[in-house]
Every structure is written in C-alpha cells, then in structure tokens.
Amino acid sequence: MKTGKNYKFWFCTGSQDLYGDECLQKVAEHSKIIVEKLNESGNLPFEVVWKPTLITNELIRRTFNEANIDDECAGVIVWMHTFSPAKSWILGLQEYRKPLLHLHTQFNMEIPYDTIDMDFMNENQSAHGDREFGHMVTRMGIERKVVVGPWSDEKLQKKIGSWMRTAIGVVESSHIRVMRVADNMRNVAVTEGDKVEAQLKFGWEIDAYPVNEIAESVAAVSESDTNALVEEYYSKYNILLEGRDPAEFRKHVAVQAQIELGFERFLEEKNYQAIVTHFGDLGALKQLPGLAIQRLMEKGYGFGAEGDWKVAAMVRLMKIMTSGMKDAKGTSMLEDYTYNLVPGKEGILEAHMLEICPSIADGPISIKCQPLSMGDREDPARLVFTSKEGTGIATSLVDLGDRFRLLINTVDCKKVEKPMPKLPVATNFWTPQPDLITGAEAWILAGGAHHTAFTYDLTAEQMGDWAEAMGIEPVYIDNETTIRNLKKDLMLGNLVYRK
C-alpha cells in the first residue's frame, strides 16, 4: 500500500519594499540559491520549492492560503532575509493551517570586514528580522519548529530533513482511518480511549465492523490466489515443521494467506490504513490473524492487538513518517512481556502472541505453527525472528480522561544472551534509558501502556514535535531522566495541558 504522497515544502522569504528593487532582487537570488543547494544536498527527504519574496500583508496572506489548499504542500519554511515588519504576517499566520518551520540563518557566512557598509547591513539582517518574526509567532501562540545555523551546514540541513518527517506525520494524521473488527479486551483499561476526542485532536477516524463481515471477505479469496501466496511464503521464509506433518502444516499456513488477502482487500475497499483485532472475538475466522497481520504491517498498515486502536493509529503514523527512508530498520507494535533483572544484563523482552512486524527482524525469518491457548481456534501460523540491535523509541499514547499524553522512551535494543527455542514468537529485547529501574518507574508514573508503537527510525525529538503540533503533552524518558524531575514535569503537564 502507499505510505504517503510526494510532498513538497514551500520556502518563503520575508522582506519589505523599504530597501529598494536592487536589494529585493538580491534577496530573491539568495533565496533561490539556498533552495537549490538544499535540494542538492541529499539531506532532505522532500523537495523544497522557492516562492516569491513576501513583502506585503496580502501577498503573505494569499501565499499561506495557497499552501493550505495545495495537497502537495506539507509545510512552509520561513526565513527573514532582511527586516520584515511582523504585523504584516498576522493575517497570514492566523489563517495558516499546516506545519511551520522558522529557519534562522543568514546568506553570508562571514562579515566582510573590509567592504561592509549600510547597504550590506540592511540587506543581511536576519539577526534582526527573524527576531521580529519570532516574537509575533510566539505572541500568537503558534506551534512551530525553529532551526538555527548556517544554511549550508550539514547538521542544519539534517534538522530540516528530520522536521520534514514530523510535518508529514502532522499532515497525514488526519488521513488515518482505523478499522476495528473487535472491541477492547474485556476489563482492560489502558487500551480504552475517547475516539471522538482522538478525531478532534489527531483527525483519526476509528470505525467498528462486525468481525464476520471481514471474515466473508476472507472466505471469498480463491484457492488459486491463496496457493500463490503460500508459494511466496515458502520461497521467502524458513519453514520450521518441528515434527508436524508437512501437508497439515501447509494447510495452517494457507489459512493465514487467505486472511492476509481477505483483510487487505477489505481494507482497500473500505479505505482503511490500520486495523485492530482481538483473540476473544474471532467470529468465523479459523485462526487468530498472525502471519497475515505481520505481513500487512510490513506493507505499511497499522495494527493494534486486543482492540488497541491508539497503537494501530500510531504504528500507521510512524510507517508514514519513515516511508522512503534509506536504510530504515523498521517499525512495529510491541508489548512489554517479561524482565531480565540480572544486574548488568537488565532488560525487557518484547513480544506478542503473534503480531510483530518483520520489518524489525534481524537474520532469518521462519514460519511456525504452534498452539495458542487463547482464542479457541486452530494453531495459527506466525513469523518468528529476533530483532535488530540499536537505539529506538517506544511510544505510548494514553487517554488520561481529560486529555491525551504521549510517552516517548528512548531504548537500547540488544541481543539476548541465549536462544529461546521453546518460545514460538518474534521478539525484541531492550533496556529502556536511562536504565531499567528508572525507566520502568518513570513509565509507570506517567501512565504508560503495556503496548507500544516502536521504531528504530524516528527520534524522540521528532515524535515530541509531533505531539506538540497536535496540542498534546509529550513526556520524554531518556538518559537525562531522573524521577525527581519527571514528577515535576508531570505536575507541570497537568497544569498546562488539562482542559
């Protein structure tokens, strides 16, 4: 499935007509050079588009409204080359509805000591103009990203590129539709949530369908289509019979192939990009969707188990934000399962009954069929693997009753000490920063869930920027975290974000 459009970002330079035509011509030339070099740098995942210099109220207002209605525009980058009176920007900023990045830079790298005169000073006064603009945006209470430094610097360019992915998340959030083919697991609290408020805040549409309606789509898949997908499975993955009859094993795998095709066709037909299931509500399905869901996640669909629509939407969001990323390491739903508490080897074994995305796999991926005590169905086929090493983030969007909070924990993924031959599920193993004891205490104090949307490919800053853009509280747990300061942050968050 598609995980995003070919978005573009507009580059809008601010100035005024006080300095004359020659100055404005240089402003436009310099802006074009910056845009050209940014696009050539290879550090930005999306194209930057130059726009004529903004010097009047009406031009600013018209440009921002054109950005609002342009489906390909995911955000605007603004920079004040000269001084630009900020009252000129008020109407445009009031009506603007997309992500905004304020680039605080300067065309020239160095002061030309021998030749500098007042013409140069008037032409190159970003230090002046950007402060004026920044004051107005702050006074208006508009959420934006500020990036500061030489425009030719690789670090600055990568910061812009990083923000672009956050901006895509903000824009695409309102296009996420989650299909619930099961309600929440009975008596579970943290997977509940206000779906109306989620649509108001994030733009998510969360709808329920009877499980047997999607089961009809599964039953309608032809035998030939099913067999063709099974052949793909057998050519792509290791087959671990573990003493089972090969023909019987293949039948179990075929059930998952039929579910994958039926689910995907139903999701495409109804225009949904994420799905939730629950082992307690399987209707006419012969197996709990396992391998099928894993494959759908790998294609870009979001997923949440036991009715967890918040995780499903967040996984989909992260899939969009990381789409097209070079050397991406993967994104998946995960669940905190069990601890290793041995000193110096502390960590959390992450898994689920079946449904972990193979995009995070490291090494061989195998198909197993094993009994599942929950669901009262056939032994489901699933993909089994271990996950990559490296730093990632585990996020948990929780409903606190009067508002949402996004927990963002930076985690260090590792290999387990020994194989786990009797564990028939995909796994990840990580140590939360700053350490297991502090990280777990902080997570519990902040109200985090046991399900997470995890990725190797985004940073805590990116997801925190997304949360702030959506008007919700981000809570960071990382190497800088202390419980004393976290408690203060949570108390402040309760004051600032409470309705």
Where are each of the predicted segments found?
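Short beta-strand segments enriched in small/hydrophobic residues
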Residues: 3-26, 175-184
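Short catalytic helix/loop segments, enriched in acidic residues and glycine
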Residues: 25-41
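Cap/lid and interdomain-hinge subdomains that line or gate substrate/regulatory clefts
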Residues: 45, 104, 109-244
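Short, well-structured alpha-helical segments in soluble
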Residues: 60-73, 90-92, 260-269
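Periplasmic-binding protein-like
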Residues: 73-83, 101-103, 272-277
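Long, internal scaffold/assembly segments composed of regular secondary structure
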Residues: 231-232, 236-324
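C-terminal catalytic subdomain
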Residues: 300-425
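Extended hydrophobic packing segments that form well-structured cores
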Residues: 376-499
